[in-house]
């Protein structure tokens, strides 16, 4: 009985499989036919759209103004060059407008196309007013996107890298802030033909990727948008402006310039604590610190454009240079008023000893001559010879030697100028630093936003 049931089940499964397989094949063929039909439909739609389409003429020519809605997505911002006053930015530049000639009806509401279709239709002739160099990426294919909605609305996106000018005012350098503009608009069409409009508000029309900053010396706190109209000999044109706000980081310059300047000034003031007679040591301190400040001032200017005004760092270096040079002038003044005298107060004792030794030598020489003259008579008379041998040789009267006075080294007293400088110089330098840093660090950054 069980055998009969199993065989019937197997027959049923085989029947279902044989019945389903043709149905599956039929369904696959239907889907394939639908795909082919869709491709055929879209091909016909595109052919119909381009049939009689003149991409030399803007939409609404003679009837209305073409409105181009724009927004920017920044994928990479930086680097910023202070010497050239320019910056580099990598963006997805998006433009949207409506072309009544490209309306269509089909199974889909949006046609997603690539750059090949973009070259066959009218697109805005947008260019960057302050761009020095612009590159449209073409690897591995041109990085362009085109979408056409059924109502004729087009979305055109390009990936661009732009080197743009960034005017900088460096009076507060390195505590400065800047606003780098990105200006763009139509090259040929005036405001009566084509106008540009930001798609969203300020925070959404220009967006920066979270990891898009490529800045070592700046922070990018935010951005803003604007719009203006400029006049030229050929008409009025709409100019869209996106401002990128930059705030410089001061840490690098504190380590590279400010701390060495402060340490050099402190080193120059060490000479006030040396004796006024230490001319070589104090000269080395003065000359070395002056040369060090000169080197620091030159190196600080190498990273800046050759502007005709003084920056905040220039003022700091100039004041430090004045302190160092004043320390050298102070030593010259002290040295000029230093009294000149013998270095040892035992000189008179030394001279007396030399005179005493000279008189003893003269007496000894006289006695030796007298003995030599009397010697022949002594040899003739044996009695006198015996007496002379037994006689003691007279010695000159010597004064008891007094212990020479101890030679003590004498110094001039500490100069009043040095005493005053030990207090005045540090106090003045500390006051200057307090005023300088309080002024610049508490100052609100002024962003030079161009209209």
UniProtKB/Swiss-Prot annotation:
Signal peptide residues on this chain, from the entry's feature table: 1-28
Residues of this chain annotated as glycosylated in UniProt: 38, 138, 201
Activity regulation, per record: Activated by pentobarbital. Inhibited by the antagonist bicuculline.
InterPro entries in alphabetical order: GABAA/Glycine_rcpt (IPR006028), GABAAa_rcpt (IPR001390), GABBAa2_rcpt (IPR005432), Gabra-1-6_TM (IPR047024), Gabra-2_ECD (IPR047023), Neur_chan_lig-bd (IPR006202), Neur_chan_lig-bd_sf (IPR036734), Neur_channel (IPR006201)
Residues spanning the membrane: 250-270, 281-300, 312-332, 421-441
Main location: membrane
PTM note: Glycosylated.
Extracellular side, ranges: 29-249, 301-311, 442-451
Disulfide topology: 166-180
UniProt xrefs under NCBIfam families: LIC (TIGR00860)
Function, as annotated: Alpha subunit of the heteropentameric ligand-gated chloride channel gated by gamma-aminobutyric acid (GABA), a major inhibitory neurotransmitter in the brain. GABA-gated chloride channels, also named GABA(A) receptors (GABAAR), consist of five subunits arranged around a central pore and contain GABA active binding site(s) located at the alpha and beta subunit interface(s). When activated by GABA, GABAARs selectively allow the flow of chloride anions across the cell membrane down their electrochemical gradient.
Protein name: Gamma-aminobutyric acid receptor subunit alpha-2
Organism lineage string: Eukaryota, Metazoa, Chordata, Craniata, Vertebrata
């Amino acid at each position: 009985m069980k055998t009969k049931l199993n065989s019937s089940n197997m027959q049923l499964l085989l029947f279902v499989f044989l019945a389903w397989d043709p149905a599956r094949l039929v369904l696959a063929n239907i889907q394939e036919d639908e795909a082919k039909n869709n491709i055929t439909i879209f091909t016909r739609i595109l052919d119909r759209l381009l049939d009689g389409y003149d991409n030399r003429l803007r939409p609404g020519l003679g009837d209305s103004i073409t409105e181009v809605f724009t927004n920017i997505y920044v994928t990479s911002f930086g680097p910023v060059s202070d010497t050239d006053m320019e910056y580099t930015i990598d963006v997805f530049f998006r433009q949207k407008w409506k072309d009544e000639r490209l309306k269509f009806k089909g199974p889909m509401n949006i046609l997603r196309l690539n750059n090949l279709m973009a070259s066959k239709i009218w697109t805005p002739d947008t260019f960057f007013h302050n761009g020095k160099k612009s590159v449209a990426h073409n690897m591995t294919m041109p990085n362009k996107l085109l979408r056409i909605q059924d109502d004729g609305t087009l979305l055109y996106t390009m990936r661009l890298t732009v080197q743009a000018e960034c005017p900088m005012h460096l009076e507060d350098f390195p505590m400065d802030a800047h606003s780098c503009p990105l200006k763009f608009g139509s090259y040929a069409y005036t405001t009566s033909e084509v106008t540009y409009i930001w798609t969203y508000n300020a925070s959404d029309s220009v967006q920066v990727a979270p990891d898009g900053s490529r800045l070592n010396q700046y922070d990018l706190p935010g951005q803003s948008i604007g719009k203006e109209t400029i006049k030229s000999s050929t008409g009025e044109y709409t100019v869209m402006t996106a401002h990128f706000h930059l705030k410089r980081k001061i840490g690098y310059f504190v380590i590279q310039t400010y701390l060495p300047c402060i340490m050099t000034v402190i080193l120059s003031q060490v000479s006030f604590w040396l004796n006024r007679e230490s001319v070589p040591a104090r000269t080395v301190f003065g000359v070395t610190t002056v040369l060090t400040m000169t080197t620091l001032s030159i190196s600080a200017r190498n990273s800046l454009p050759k502007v005709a005004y003084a920056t905040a760092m220039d003022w700091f270096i100039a004041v430090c240079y004045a302190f160092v040079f004043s320390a050298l002038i102070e030593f010259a003044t002290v040295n000029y008023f230093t009294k000149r005298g013998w270095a040892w107060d035992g000189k008179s004792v030394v001279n007396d000893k030399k005179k005493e030794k000279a008189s003893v030598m003269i007496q000894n020489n006289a006695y030796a001559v007298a003995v030599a003259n009397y010697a022949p008579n002594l040899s003739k008379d044996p009695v006198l010879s015996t007496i002379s041998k037994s006689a003691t040789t007279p010695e000159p009267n010597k004064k008891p030697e007094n212990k020479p006075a101890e030679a003590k080294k004498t110094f001039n007293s500490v100069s009043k100028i040095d005493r005053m400088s030990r207090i005045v110089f540090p106090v003045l330098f500390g006051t200057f630093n307090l005023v300088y840093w309080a002024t610049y660090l508490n100052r609100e950054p002024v962003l030079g936003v161009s209209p």
